[in-house]
C-alpha cells in the first residue's frame, strides 16, 4: 500500500489545532519566534502526544510582527544559534511530557530562503545535527535544505504543499501573487494526488514538473482549513493511500 506523511504547522494561534491533530501524522510546533509561547508549546505537545502524532520543531527568524514571513539576511552563525535555541526549548517541553522530537521544519521566510540559499541551509542543518543527529529535516522538495541535511548525514523529507501553487522550477509561487494559493478544493485534491501517486505537479504555467513527495503540508489557518483537511484525508483513504509518519 502507498503511504504518505501529512503534516501541519501548529501552535500558531489557530483554533483548529486539536481537531487537526486527529487528521495528520506529523505536527510542526511553533517555537515562539514567529508565533506561540511556552503555554501553546506545552498544550500543543500534550494534544499531539495524546493523538500519537509525531512532533517536530518549527523554528523561524525572529519576526513576530510579520509572522516569520519577512526575509532576513543574518550571518549563518546567528541562524545556527537561533535554530538551536528554538529546537532545544521545544525539546525540553516534549521530554518533560514523556515524548521526544522527531523532526525539524523551518517556518516561513526561513524555510523559503533555505530552499535556495546554501549557506543558510547548511546553518540550519548543522544546528539540527549538533542538537540530535537522529532528527529528520523537512524541506521543500528538491531544495537546498534537503541537500544540506543529507550531506551532513541527516534524514531529510522532501515536502510538498496541498494548497500552494508551483513555479516551473519546482519552487512555490510567492504569497500575494496570482496562483500562490489554490482556493478551489478540487484543484488542491487533484494536485495532492498527482504529487503523491505520480510524483509530479502542474505549475501555474501548465508545465508538469517532477517532484518527490515524502510529506504533505496541510495549512491549519483559514475558515475552511479543517474541512479541507478532512477531505484530503478521506480522499487519500479512498485511493488506498495510508497516512503515517515515517512513510
Curated annotation (Swiss-Prot):
Pfam families: LamB_YcsF. Keywords: ATP-binding, Hydrolase, Nucleotide-binding. It is an enzyme of class 3 (hydrolase). It comes from the Bacteria. Belongs to the LamB/PxpA family. Catalyzes the cleavage of 5-oxoproline to form L-glutamate coupled to the hydrolysis of ATP to ADP and inorganic phosphate. Forms a complex composed of PxpA, PxpB and PxpC. This is 5-oxoprolinase subunit A 1. It comes from Ralstonia nicotianae (strain ATCC BAA-1114 / GMI1000). The lineage of its organism: Bacteria, Pseudomonadati, Pseudomonadota, Betaproteobacteria, Burkholderiales.
